[in-house]
């Protein structure tokens, strides 16, 4: 069953994986980020979200900022040793490893997420699509969420509401624009070998059609 949620915010950053040092955002929201927003509003083991379309409803504008980040990572081998032996330190001293990095992020963003959900084998006997649809709409209308949804990073919170009327497409987004290869989502079908999945993103009149995970043109 289909649902449309309008989302907007001051800033967004959907980081390109090929940019290793400085953060550079994709031009528009990625399907995986859209799924994350919907799961923040309503998640249930009995349903699985599938993003169908992303409507871009604000001009694409970039700005440069500097963000504080931690340069170190927790070492999995060290963490395992601490857990097994019960001694040692397993933390990051952010005051010692903090550093500033430049980031090219989006500003003044607005999207409409069109998605549907499929029932899964984990649905309870009393679960059904109509029940889930009512819960989702009620939560969106009341602004309820399990955790604060965000645009790519928790520093950029999302405002949202149930879409009751499609905003107009900005004139500068009319026509066709090739956005290149974009992250579709992560493939968790094999927990021991999680892989990124990409698709060729083409925006037409401000609308990005999203293929299914195993659809035509999807690359692993």
Feature names for model-found ranges:
Residues 19, 24-69:
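Glycine/small-residue-rich interface belts in oligomeric ring/scaffold proteins
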Residues 7-11, 58, 113-121:
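Beta-strand elements of well-folded, non-transmembrane domains
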Residues 69-71, 79-220:
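Internal, well-folded beta-alpha domain core
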Residues 2, 51, 108-112:
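Broad gene-expression machinery/nucleic-acid interaction feature
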